[in-house]
Amino acid sequence: MTVTEQKIILYLVSQIHKDDDDFKMYSLPIQHFYELLGYRGSPKYSEMRDITRNLIKKILEIKEGKKLKQMSWISYVEYDEHSGRVYLSFDPRLKPYLLQLKKEFTTYRLKNVMELKSGYSIRIYEILKRWQFINDVKIPLDELRKMVGATDKYLEKRVLAPAQKEITEKTDLSFEYKEVKSGRKVVAIRFFIRERPMGEASVISEIPHETSGIDVLYSPFLSRFCRARPAAAAKGVRKDRGAGATSVRRGLAR
């Protein structure tokens, strides 16, 4: 997924409430939707149509045992120039994954990711937010690659370092990280996470009032698929507690 497509999905997820039993038709003013996508000025319908048309074509592949399911993120988009609103809805087949996994959801403020320009930064932020109260989390390298959708061997240079700079400047978190080695081989990345008052961060651009204060309901399922190609979910994340470590299993088996 592109960064813009990720932000559309995050906005829709932010509209889900933990007590919802069904998807709704989600809407917002077209002007706000245009700004949400990172544009300024008067909305250009051709640009928005191209973005949502491409998003509807994005296919998820979900493997559950012997079954392979294919579905779209979005099943319907409507631009109503008379009311000045855009309407979007999830594919109803996503209900078991986004509604019935409520207990795995972690909330964060939508405005904390809307200014991020890198898809990697968004995914790293979500990972950190999930573990922010642990403060110190170690993630095996192969699992981290799957979680962020990074196949490039230059993970530190192209993913971690840029994400660290952008997240620190624009969100409520900062983090340090270091490589964990076995011999000469890097086998894991250890993150040291710190929550920051938003006043410490650079000034965040104005975000429409309908989207700035709402929470995103983040789940491992969402992080698993918000990237260009669907990939397997990380099978476990180890969180360090003194000398021992607890393995936490999330997501669907591949």
Language-model-derived ranges and their functions:
Residues M1-A233, A245-G251:
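Charged, alpha-helix-forming regions
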